């Protein structure tokens, strides 16, 4: 398979420092809003990268569920591989690839668990099918056949046919406290624009990076 000639030019326009918000969360929200308005597929999908005890990196796609001045929030099974890795090393990075807009956002920071109240509030807002799936699946565990998972789901569906579904103790969220956010905008002739926001105490330093 020949891959060397697969390329394209970036022509959506550049990014200048004067166009950036002073706060990176404000800038991120602007870009996210534009990604949603452009009807991108899964605009809140992000790559979440963690490392295990041996320094081996792992990545997976997770949906962003909230972002504010306190950080970026996602939810997962607390018995999953990523949750175990974050228990060992809370350092984390997030990546949003908004290809149709020729944009990327890369975030580094530290993950911390959400409170039980925060978990309950979000879990109760999910569709019932998603709640059942969260309980049925022991994420990252080995299973011999899909039928086992489907059988457990149907069993739970019957069990909770009436009434509320309790928040499982092994399910919850993480908040990523941001250390840095990089905004990348594709440019002509591979002269891309990159701006890095780095947290310095209560302020943000902004640097342009070479592409």
Curated annotation (Swiss-Prot):
Name the record gives this protein: Pyridoxine/pyridoxamine 5'-phosphate oxidase
Keywords tagged on the record: Flavoprotein, FMN, Oxidoreductase, Pyridoxine biosynthesis
EC number: 1.4.3.5
Cofactor: FMN
Subunit structure: Homodimer.
UniProt source species: Vibrio atlanticus (strain LGP32) (Vibrio splendidus (strain Mel32))
Recorded catalytic activity of this chain's protein: pyridoxamine 5'-phosphate + O2 + H2O = pyridoxal 5'-phosphate + H2O2 + NH4(+); pyridoxine 5'-phosphate + O2 = pyridoxal 5'-phosphate + H2O2
A molecular function (GO) term: pyridoxamine phosphate oxidase activity
Chain segments annotated as coiled-coil in the UniProt record: none
Gene expressing this chain: pdxH
Metabolic or biological pathway: Cofactor metabolism; pyridoxal 5'-phosphate salvage; pyridoxal 5'-phosphate from pyridoxamine 5'-phosphate: step 1/1; Cofactor metabolism; pyridoxal 5'-phosphate salvage; pyridoxal 5'-phosphate from pyridoxine 5'-phosphate: step 1/1
Family as reported in the entry's similarity comment: Belongs to the pyridoxamine 5'-phosphate oxidase family.
UniProt record, GO biological process: pyridoxine biosynthetic process
Sites where the protein binds FMN: 60-65, 75-76, 81-82, 104, 139-140, 184, 194
Annotated NCBIfam families: pdxH, PRK05679.1
Function: Catalyzes the oxidation of either pyridoxine 5'-phosphate (PNP) or pyridoxamine 5'-phosphate (PMP) into pyridoxal 5'-phosphate (PLP).
Pfam families named among the record's database cross-references: PNP_phzG_C, PNPOx_N
Annotated substrate binding sites: 7-10, 65, 122, 126, 130, 190-192
Cofactor-binding details, from the entry: Binds 1 FMN per subunit.
UniProt-listed InterPro entries: Pyridox_Oxase, Pyridox_Oxase_CS, Pyridox_Oxase_N, Pyridoxamine_oxidase_dimer_C, Split_barrel_FMN-bd
């Amino acid at each position: 398979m020949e891959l060397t000639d697969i390329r394209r030019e970036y022509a959506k326009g550049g990014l200048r420092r004067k166009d950036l918000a002073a706060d990176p969360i404000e800038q991120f929200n602007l870009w996210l809003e534009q990604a949603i308005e452009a009807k991108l597929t899964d605009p809140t999908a992000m790559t979440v990268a963690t490392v295990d005890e041996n320094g081996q990196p792992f990545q997976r796609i997770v949906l962003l569920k909230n972002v504010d001045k306190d950080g970026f929030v996602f939810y997962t099974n607390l018995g999953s591989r990523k949750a175990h890795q974050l228990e060992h090393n809370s350092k984390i990075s997030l990546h949003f690839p908004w290809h149709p807009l020729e944009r990327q956002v890369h975030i580094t920071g530290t993950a911390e668990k959400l409170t039980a109240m925060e978990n309950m509030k979000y879990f109760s807002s999910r569709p019932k099918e998603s709640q059942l799936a969260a309980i049925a699946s022991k994420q990252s565990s080995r299973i011999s056949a899909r039928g086992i998972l489907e059988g457990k789901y149907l069993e739970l569906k019957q069990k909770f046919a009436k009434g509320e579904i309790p928040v499982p103790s092994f399910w919850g969220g993480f908040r990523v406290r941001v250390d840095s956010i990089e905004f990348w905008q594709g440019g002509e002739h591979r002269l891309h624009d990159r701006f890095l926001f780095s947290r310095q105490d209560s302020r943000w330093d902004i640097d342009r990076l070479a592409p």
